[in-house]
Amino acid sequence: ALGLIPKFTLGFGVPITAQSLGVMLCGTVLGAWRGGLAALLFVALVALGLPLLAGGRGGLGVFASPTVGFLVGFPIGAFVTGFIMDQWRSAPVGLAAGVSAVLGGILVVYAFGIFGMMMTLNKSLLEATLLVQAFIPGDLIKAVLAGFITSGLAKARPASVLSRS
């Protein structure tokens, strides 16, 4: 459903979307393994051609675009986000979710995204890193949202936040 929110494509072919929030929530809510597998299923469905990405994109062609690294990083980012949530049980849920989302949902996913942009756009590490800076403010807002959403869900239905069970 987050792919249905309109995208804003930057000049180098990578769109700003709400989908990274989904990756963050996979980890904060479902935990490491379930979250990583849910994100992997999403990527597999995209590869099979389902139009789940922003703008109704799907199919193997998206894996030849500058977004390939981000897509490959989604399951790993969700896993890392969930792993941090699983390990950091002593912190308040919202704080743990926000920090986990930054570390797994931003840093890990960006590492893959930067590599993908280096390969598809023929950019240096520095050039690709500078290109992704446009995403940082929005993704930090999404990480804060992931913290609030996960905290609210934990209060309303504690058993539904599997990263804490």
Predicted regions and their residues:
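Hydrophobic transmembrane alpha-helices
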Residues: 1-36
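Alpha-helical architecture
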Residues: 17, 29, 63, 111, ...
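Membrane-embedded alpha-helical hairpins and interfacial helices in multi-pass inner-membrane proteins
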Residues: 12, 56, 88-165
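Alpha-helical transmembrane segments in multi-pass membrane proteins
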Residues: 3, 23, 27, 38-46, ...
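Residue-level signature of transmembrane alpha-helical entry/exit and packing/kink sites
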Residues: 16-23, 35, 66, 70, ...
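Structural signal for the C-terminal ends of transmembrane alpha-helices
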Residues: 29-33, 80-88, 152-157
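Juxtamembrane membrane-interface segments at transmembrane alpha-helix termini
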Residues: 27-29, 49-56, 141-143
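Interfacial aromatic-anchored transmembrane helix boundaries in multi-pass membrane proteins
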Residues: 2-15, 43-77
